[in-house]
Structure formats: C-alpha cells, structure tokens
Amino acid sequence: MRLLAWLIFLANWGGARAEPGKFWHIADLHLDPDYKVSKDPFQVCPSAGSQPVPDAGPWGDYLCDSPWALINSSIYAMKEIEPEPDFILWTGDDTPHVPDEKLGEAAVLEIVERLTKLIREVFPDTKVYAALGNHDFHPKNQFPAGSNNIYNQIAELWKPWLSNESIALFKKGAFYCEKLPGPSGAGRIVVLNTNLYYTSNALTADMADPGQQFQWLEDVLTDASKAGDMVYIVGHVPPGFFEKTQNKAWFREGFNEKYLKVVRKHHRVIAGQFFGHHHTDSFRMLYDDAGVPISAMFITPGVTPWKTTLPGVVNGANNPAIRVFEYDRATLSLKDMVTYFMNLSQANAQGTPRWELEYQLTEAYGVPDASAHSMHTVLDRIAGDQSTLQRYYVYNSVSYSAGVCDEACSMQHVCAMRQVDIDAYTTCLYASGTTPVPQLPLLLMALLGLCTLVL
C-alpha cells in the first residue's frame, strides 16, 4: 500500500514539474506604407496629419506610424533574440492613424496581409494567435457583431494558424479559442474581439452581448474548468482606463462590467490576460470582493512610436518595443516578462537599429515571478515608493520620456492600474484629491469626426 502511494506521489510530482517555455507578444505595429524620409517636413508621413515632421530618419519618427523598415527590423529582432518561441501573440492595430477616406477596405486587407506574410516568413513553424485591433477594419472602430468581408478575408489569411472550428468562429465574430501547443496539452488561448465593446464602435452600442461573445466566453471558461485546463485571454482593446490621462474608458460601461464579472467568476482558470491598444507599457490588477489579487492584465507597448493625439496626454510617444514572456508550459503560470526596445533617436542618428534589453520584470521590481500576487506587490511599490514609480514611468513610455511623474501623474497611473471597474476608478481619483476631468474634449472631437485618430 505504501509502495502504491509512493508511486502515485512520484507520478504527480513528475507531472507537476516545471516545463519552462517562452512566447512573444507584439502589439500595435501600425504600418504607414507611405512613410518616406523627405526634406519637406509635410511630406514624410500621412499618419502625422497636418503636423510637420522635421529631421525624419530611416527608422521612423515619433510623430509618425511605423515605416516598413522599423516593422521588418522588429520581427527579425524577435527571431534573433528568441528564435524558437512556443508561440506568438499578435494583438492587432496594423494600419496607420489616417482618416478612413485615405485608407479603405482594400488597403486595410493589404496591410494585414503584408504583415502576416512577414511574420510567417520569419517564423514559418511557429503558431501565431492573432487578434484584430480597432484600426484593422473599414471604417475603423466600426466592427459588426456578425459576418462580413473583412472577417472572412482575414480568416482565410490566418488559416495556417487556425483550426477549422476557429476559422468558422472568426468569420462570424473575429474571436476564437485554440489549444496551446506542447506536450502537456493543458492550456488554451482565448482570442477576443474586444473592438465590439469599444466606446468608439457605434454599431454595438445598444447590444447586450454583441456576437454572443460573452456567452461564448462563459462556455469556454466553464469547459476549461471541467477539463482542468488553464487559459490565456488575448485581445486588443483592454477594459478599464488609459493611464496617461483621466477618465478615458475604452469599453462601454455595461460591457466593462460584464467582462469583469466573467473574469472574476472564472479567475481560477485564467492564467493571464494580454492586451495592447495603449502603445504604452502598463498592467491592470483585478481583485475579489475581499481585496485579494486574482488576475493580472498585461498591456504590451507598441512597435509604432506614434505620438497620440488624445486630449490631455503629455509626451504621448514611445520607443518601439517587443516583449517575451517566460512561462510554465504545464500550468501556464507566468514566470517573467522581458521587454526589448529600439532607441529610435539613437537608431536614426547612427543609421543602424539596435534592439536592446529595456528591463526584466523580476529584476526591475524585485519579485519572484509575474503572478497576480507578484504584480500586486509591484503595484504597491509603485504606489508607495517614488523611485519605483519613476522607474515604472520611464518604462511606461519605453524609455522615451525622462520627465518626473508628480503626484497627479501618480494618481492617474495608480488608479488606472488598481481599479478596472468604472465606479471604483472614479472613487479612487476623488479619494486622491484629484477631480476627474470631464470628457468634453473627446465629445467635441467626436462631433468634429476626429476621434478615429486618437489611438
């Protein structure tokens, strides 16, 4: 009997041993196909709008979206740094920040196809889990809750990465679920179309559950729990608020509430959440009713260096970034996060791009891993220690902004990271003595038809 118990123990111990793996996360590539180095500052890039771009370099400019040279360099840098990842997360926003009339459906599809071919060329044997961003549609932001030509065409483009079931789902609503590769077979990737919940999407504003995605997510997470699987949730637009200004929520309030309700209900099977959209480097914490951290949401910085036009944002540009996660293949627990970047000014001055380590999460913040508990510790240190806050603030812009994060800045960032719930976020700002800024400028922009360019 003792021998049998010992054999069972050994079997369980062997099954629970760590299986270290790595995966890439890239976001917000925003190719500007018309970028060119020009002596005329008004002829450099359409994505700069009416702003002059003096002294533009071959690798890009902070007022512009990515030239092809920058995107090409970023994907090949991934291959050089970690050539055999288990998989790649690619969370969308591929087209430039230009008005709809300067783009069109054919141009959107052409850009997505061009980037897809590049990634497949550099990583021919790597599974890619790709999501659409709010700019990956025409007209931008206006994602329908049902089938359409763009969903159909992109599903065909991504066919080598998708199962037959995922292709059918993608054509209906641009979301899907895939089993993770690897020997354990105990993990799933859920790719969401969170553009359906975006405040700028007028098509879904009055819907309770666009595309039935919430119900589908409930079903997938329930099934994962029964099967003993862990899940990564992936999307473009995150819930909660932008940290570089006040009171800018991305989801409509009802959708934000529903998403948080689903995640809190199923948090035991959710090993990580991964989003983009911000172009900045940040994270969000979710807590249960007792205040215990239950999930961390990682917002990956963009490849594009483009300076946001969102009202209230100061120094809204960033250096280009790519990110690799270290994880346990058996449990999907996140062990570390390493961000690499290109100093764009330096690359243009030297004529050669150099992708270098910006920081490693565990070393930068002195935590053992990237679990929800550890990220809660990181947030507490950011909120309570000025030097840690300042370090985070530099990382937030991918080492672009060297300015000081003062008290008002600190509250904007900390409240956004700590409170993803809309009412709790507002309470956090008031409790800090900061009066939330009304969204009148955004309303005026919407009336003027300009809101499509801000992110």
Swiss-Prot record:
EC number: 3.1.4.-
UniProt KW Lipid metabolism keyword: yes
Positions annotated as glycosylated: N72, N164, N343
Binding residues annotated for Zn(2+) 2, in chain numbering: D93, N134, H236, H277
Pfam families xrefs: ASMase_C, Metallophos
Record keywords: Cell membrane, Disulfide bond, Glycoprotein, Glycosidase, GPI-anchor, Hydrolase, Immunity, Inflammatory response, Innate immunity, Lipid degradation, Lipid metabolism, Lipoprotein, Membrane, Metal-binding, Secreted, Signal, Zinc
Topological type in the membrane: Lipid-anchor; GPI-anchor
Cofactors: Zn(2+)
Principal EC category: hydrolase
Any single GO CC term annotated in Swiss-Prot or TrEMBL for this entry: side of membrane
Swiss-Prot/TrEMBL GO biological process terms: inflammatory response; innate immune response; membrane lipid catabolic process; negative regulation of inflammatory response; negative regulation of toll-like receptor signaling pathway; sphingomyelin catabolic process
Subunit structure as annotated in this protein's UniProt entry: Interacts with TLR4, TLR7, TLR8 and TLR9.
Protein purpose: Lipid-modulating phosphodiesterase. Active on the surface of macrophages and dendritic cells and strongly influences macrophage lipid composition and membrane fluidity. Acts as a negative regulator of Toll-like receptor signaling. Has in vitro phosphodiesterase activity, but the physiological substrate is unknown. Lacks activity with phosphocholine-containing lipids, but can cleave CDP-choline, and can release phosphate from ATP and ADP (in vitro).
UniProt name for this protein: Acid sphingomyelinase-like phosphodiesterase 3b
Organism of derivation: Homo sapiens
